[in-house]
């Protein structure tokens, strides 16, 4: 199964029908959902994997969540979705306020609390794992970053492929571009996901990283696939009635990786045709999230 390591928090999504009235009331629509990039990927992947078997476990999440009622609720949501929550309970559960302006622009106020304080993960949490996915958010904050590197080392020891999502151009810049490139080189992921801003920040087009597959998303524009044999692009089907972009990138990763692990685990040859199918699966799942509030697939 797919295993993801990272954050499990509450998302508080605020839609503004008009500009924010500073110092006064602003009528808004507010929705509270489970959030965190890692938990998003795990839930979306589980929804795919458990579609035909409602009693199965579709994905695993390694995370730390608060020893509080909110933490209990988030774990319950994971279990209902078909995720195996391998979590440490300690401290206070984190929350992220996502403010969506009338033009769709998102501003996030983050309080990750205990979600960045994971110290370690036992080896048996990797039993039955076929692929480990790591959002780069998990590499930027201690002690989660050290725990994540230890999990990656365990994955390598068990011959479990690792994939990385670049997550955030601004956080990469704050972390240090050269330092981030060195981390990627050390991790040796099978796949690196990024959007155009992240690809530009990492200098992927001018100074390629030695990764078997780089996937560059560009919203509604074609997705670029870069392998050691060259590059190709895949057209993106238009999406109507977009409600919220929160979690769409995580949904793409989940859809892509579900197809990828079914085709490529244990296989040495990567073909453009099969990779295109992975991209299409990613965008198909992302479209469902784009039509739903927050990082959910409530609208089918």
Model-derived regions, located:
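A general structural signal for well-ordered alpha-helical segments in protein cores
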Residues: 38-42, 71, 148, 164, ...
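Glycine-rich phosphate/adenosyl-contacting loop at the front of the ribokinase-like
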Residues: 1-60, 73-76, 96, 242
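Ribokinase/PfkB-type carbohydrate-kinase core domain
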Residues: 1-8, 75-88, 100-232, 265, ...
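Beta-strand->loop->alpha-helix junctions that form or flank phosphate-binding loops
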Residues: 31, 62-67, 82-94, 212-218, ...
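Short, conserved phosphate/pyrophosphate- and ester-handling motifs at nucleotide-, phospho-/glycolipid
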Residues: 45, 195, 249
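Conserved phosphate-binding/catalytic region of the ribokinase-like
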Residues: 1-3, 204-300
